[in-house]
């Protein structure tokens, strides 16, 4: 059973949903307050969505300096899996663990609705139970979700297969290359703007996000990408 640390910052508001989704996938999930400096007991670290520090200055810009981030960086540099969801994605970019950044939506409005995304790579600890090319319906809820990067960085992401999720049918926020999620070069750090924890059971409107969390536990059991497959219709019990 993988131990999953869900980091809580002042202003986090998706931490409980994220912890419950990880538990339902079979993980041993627990909260870590932003003042903590030790993540030695964690196999996986998740930075959940919300409005850390009220999104003052810039989304994720202050959280990046929280004491816990030193441990998050160390965990990532040691090859440990790290997932940032929405505000967590913003924090990972601010911390330099992921390339690029997230800016104000092109329409200058907060968006809260389901969108469609395509899985671009299954070669991460969080997507290996999906099939590349598979489309998912997941909710978004952000005002600063427009992914940006320098042309050279964007070209490298595409060439190296580091784009994890891509918006399809529409680009809701003006993200460069329709990018909804990226990974670092080692593919152990992943940031996504959609909220998979809000789509882990049919009672929530769908289960397309369940395998994000199931992937974490399945990889622990097999230690090999692709050894375990979960059917499209399977979902977590909540």
Predicted segments, located by residue:
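NAD(P)-dependent dehydrogenase/reductase Rossmann-like domain
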Residues: 163-186, 228, 235-238
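Active-site metal-binding loops of divalent metal-dependent hydrolases
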Residues: 50-51, 88, 143, 196
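Pocket-forming structural segment of enzyme catalytic cores
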Residues: 97-178
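Structured helix-beta-strand junction loops
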Residues: 25, 78-79, 159-161, 185
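A glycine-centered loop/beta-turn motif at secondary-structure junctions
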Residues: 179-204
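N-terminal beta1-alpha1 cap of cysteine-dependent amidohydrolase-like domains
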Residues: 1-85, 93-99, 103-105, 110-111, ...
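Beta-strand-turn-beta hairpins that frame and shape the catalytic cleft
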Residues: 1-2, 133-135, 184-189
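Active-site-proximal beta-strand elements of phosphoester/diester hydrolases
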Residues: 5-6, 137-141, 190-194
């Amino acid at each position: 059973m993988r131990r999953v640390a869900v980091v809580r910052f002042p202003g986090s508001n998706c931490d409980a949903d994220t912890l419950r989704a990880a538990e339902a996938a079979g993980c041993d999930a627990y909260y870590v307050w932003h003042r903590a400096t030790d993540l030695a007991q964690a196999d996986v670290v998740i930075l959940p969505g919300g409005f850390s520090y009220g999104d003052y200055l810039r989304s994720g810009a202050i959280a990046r300096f929280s004491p816990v981030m030193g441990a998050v960086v160390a965990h990532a540099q040691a090859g440990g899996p790290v997932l940032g969801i929405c505000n967590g994605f913003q924090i990972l970019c601010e911390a330099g663990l992921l390339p690029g950044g997230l800016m104000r939506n092109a329409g200058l409005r907060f968006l809260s609705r389901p969108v469609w995304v395509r899985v671009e790579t299954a070669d991460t600890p969080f997507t290996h139970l999906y099939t590349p090319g598979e489309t998912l319906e997941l909710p978004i809820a952000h005002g600063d979700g427009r992914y940006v990067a320098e042309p050279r960085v964007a070209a490298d992401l595409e060439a190296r297969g580091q784009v994890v999720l891509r918006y399809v049918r529409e680009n809701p926020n003006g993200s460069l290359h329709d990018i909804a999620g990226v990974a670092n070069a080692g593919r152990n750090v992943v940031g996504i703007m959609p909220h998979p924890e809000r789509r882990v059971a049919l009672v929530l409107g769908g289960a397309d996000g369940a395998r994000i969390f199931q992937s974490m536990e399945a990889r622990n059991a097999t230690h090999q990408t692709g050894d375990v497959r979960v059917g499209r219709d399977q979902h977590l019990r909540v």
